[in-house]
């Protein structure tokens, strides 16, 4: 699978070489390399191919008793031999994606201090805020191109996990490599340890993070600024991905820094891009336009509102005015439909609130604001998207009412992990007589209904962010814009089996994700060039750059370099 046979010249030898995950080959070191690098006697006699190694570790993986055990085992391989880890993933991505990322990574974050084995990435704690430059210089990799950073305050649907949130950057960067071909040598996971308000963690004698309540307000903002400044000094061209920051910080941080460096928030922008790509694919398959849809959101946090704004932007591209587009988006939170008469709406929610006069008479009961069923009924909804983190909010009554207004509604329960999903695909299909188009945030098995097998699309950000990262790295874009994200959404939609005629799933199978990432990368890079955010080149040069930056897991020959 390697694209080059050029040898790699390295200065490490003996046990030190075996302890470097990026360079270790384990039993695959050749006889010549074992002599040249002082490895004789440190490894079993037999020299194995990487395929033979994959067979062994997969056999060991299958012996693990639980999904968490499998996660721990895969991480141990990653910490020992990164090339073997990614070759194993490449061979079994469908099976292992739910183990290295959602839903299993959620439990791994909760148990982080209990299952901790060895260091990976950087832990930057608030008490060490005056040493951030030194900490970044301590990174074992120099040529960092992508950083995923979290402060762990909103890990999936699990809330504040303290330093346990490190599992998310590690998992996300594993997907950058497995799905988007970004070399693991160019990636760095970081957790910002600003304390935790999770009392269970503070009281846990095994908790490894800073035992202090979360820093907030100006102290928090100043700490983030110190971190951003230090990153820009160390790696001025890096792509910085914000991950699992709380709603109150996620949008303000994105708005503050998106024009200062190449950054994006995957929870807001990545989720929005894959959701819009899924919605565009469904519309194309039904020969409808996005502007014909009425979209109801259950959950009005930063992720839901980010998706809504991305849909509005796509509707405007189709020709709707902004006011027309906003009238087709309905945000429902725990109090009901967001309307202008609501108090305490956040700024990004106010833009999506319906005019009170437009929804007068929608309230069926004694509630102050229209509830979900009221909204679905009166809006004539055709699409319903769940980003609430609350199990069971898509009730049978609500889904059946949705089906009344649309023969083939698109239903997207996106909350993670599976225990938080608004409704299961089996429930949705049963309540719509098998007619709904379903895309979920977590993986679900195919559903048998009406004598046919329905494959469930996983509307997972892994379809989007690896391709965005690959495109940014390939063209050396200086920023990530909304138009680049829209280009990614359109590229994803064009890959849908429903659009290409290759199947009935809304999104392509995971076995095709590397090709999908390449197409998204090209679309993103083209748009970056069109906006003047990357040097203009020919399309052929872009394709060559994408392939040049697409790392494949295979061993290179080593040669000894004198120190």
Swiss-Prot record:
GO terms for biological process: malate metabolic process. Its cofactor is Mg(2+); Mn(2+). InterPro entries: Aminoacid_DH-like_N_sf (IPR046346), Malic_enzyme_CS (IPR015884), Malic_N_dom (IPR012301), Malic_N_dom_sf (IPR037062), Malic_NAD-bd (IPR012302), Malic_OxRdtase (IPR001891), NAD(P)-bd_dom_sf (IPR036291), NAD_malic_enz_proteobac (IPR023667). Gene3D superfamilies: Malic enzyme, N-terminal domain, NAD(P)-binding Rossmann-like Domain. The keyword Oxidoreductase applies. GO terms for cellular component: cytosol. NAD(+) binds at residues 154, 267, 416. The active site is at residues 101, 172. It catalyses: (S)-malate + NAD(+) = pyruvate + CO2 + NADH; oxaloacetate + H(+) = pyruvate + CO2. Homotetramer. This is NAD-dependent malic enzyme. The gene is maeA.
